[in-house]
Amino acid sequence: VWAEHSMWVQDPQYALALKGGVTIFHVLPGSANLIGGRGVTVKNLQRNTIQSMKYPDAKHSLKMACGENPKRVYGNRGQAPSTRMGNFAGYRKAWIEAENYLNKIEVYDSKSDEEKMVESPPKRDLKLDTLRDVLKDEILVHIHCYRAEEMALMIDVAKEFNYKITAFHHGVEAYKIADLLADNGICGALWADWWGFKHEAYDMVQANIAIVDQARGGKGCAIVHSDDERGI
């Protein structure tokens, strides 16, 4: 799914956010799925179409999620994943499929015009189109993740399949691996003052953002994302 396909240009929250000084949004799909879909960057302008709000040349993003959300949503339906082990098996399976898809496309593209006349291109797959573009460094990866050990494991998966994680969202335990995040050029989009609402969100410290930002002598990257009760 693509977030831009469900945005409402007349949403009153745009005007409310503008009063608070927010001029640009990055809008992402939700966090119920291992691999949720594409996000988009838009200007906070009064326009009649999403296309006219898009920020010029901004890359799409891919929203992923780890931890309790996907295993709860699918486990409650009697489907996989229902454990954290299942989550990681699902990521790796998807990236293997994406590598194979990319390889088939590259092989086809390398053929001569004469060969292409008699051979059909690989069948298009919208999900794998997005993952392929991540592998080509054309889409930025954003991951909903709370616990330190899971963020570290997600970094392992990214290295296994040679893509980069741009940011972890929420990251209440990011302070525990601040140096690891800095070493890998990964930002934290973190809450300033919200935690404890579920098991994986308990172990927070109020210095979380500062610790992540100042890691490795100031080479870290942390931004504050809203914890406003109105959902902005």
Predicted feature locations:
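Acidic, glycine-rich loop-and-beta core segments that form the ion-binding/anion-interacting portion
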Residues: 155-162, 172-175, 183
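Active-site gating loops and adjacent loop-to-helix segments of metal-dependent hydrolytic enzymes
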Residues: 1-4, 48, 70-73, 185-190
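Polyanionic/metal-chelating signatures
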Residues: 13, 18-167
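His/Asp/Glu-enriched, well-ordered alpha-helical/loop segment
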Residues: 140, 179-182, 186-232
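Short acidic loop-to-helix transition motifs that present clustered carboxylates
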Residues: 148-150, 171-176
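Short, acidic/turn-prone active-site loops that include or flank metal/cofactor-
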Residues: 47, 170-172, 192-197
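Glycine- and other small-residue-rich loops at beta-strand/loop junctions that grip anionic moieties
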Residues: 5, 120, 143-146, 169-170, ...
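Aromatic/His-enriched, Gly/Pro-containing loop or helix-boundary segments
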Residues: 1-15
